[in-house]
Curated annotation (Swiss-Prot):
Protein name stated in the entry: Fusaric acid resistance protein FusB
Origin superkingdom: Bacteria
Residue ranges, compositional bias (Low complexity): 81-142
Gene for this chain: fusB
Any GO CC annotation of this UniProt entry: plasma membrane
Region of interest (Disordered), ranges: 73-142
Length: 142
């Protein structure tokens, strides 16, 4: 007679491999499929509500859902709403409106001037150099 019981975790069973494969899928592709399902569900709910309210352009509601549910917009809006003066070296109003954390210098928000990083402060004008914008090429004085 076997020393292990049929209910022991070492026995595995027919569903152990399926459970492990599902867990692996859920960590990789499952998040994307879940996001797609939520976006489509929200779009169809918005379409149904707009048709029920007899709005003139129901497609506008669906378009709005897809614009609002962009994945990259969420971290920027969260970062912009939680800016605190203690963390940033600039004023709290500027850090909240720009969505950038001045201390970390990382911002992938559409609000940042260069797109991928927060713009560094403009250099001070000296006799040998002109003040340049952070994303434009240097302007040489004549």
């Amino acid at each position: 007679m076997s020393a292990s019981s049929p209910l022991s975790p070492t026995a595995g069973g027919p569903f152990a491999a399926w459970y492990a494969a599902f867990g692996d899928w859920a960590r990789t592709d499952g998040a994307a499929w879940l996001y797609l399902f939520k976006a489509l569900l929200a779009a169809f709910i918005a379409l149904g509500v707009s048709m029920r309210l007899d709005l003139p352009a129901p497609k506008t509601a669906m378009t709005t859902v897809f614009i609002v549910m962009q994945r990259k917009a969420a971290p920027c809006s969260r970062k912009a709403s939680t800016g605190s003066p203690a963390r940033s070296s600039g004023s709290s109003r500027r850090s909240r409106s720009s969505g950038c954390s001045r201390s970390s210098r990382s911002c992938s928000c559409w609000r940042s001037p260069c797109g991928s990083r927060c713009a560094p402060p403009a250099p001070r004008a000296t006799a040998t150099s002109a003040v340049t914008a952070s994303c434009s090429p240097a302007i040489r004085p004549r």
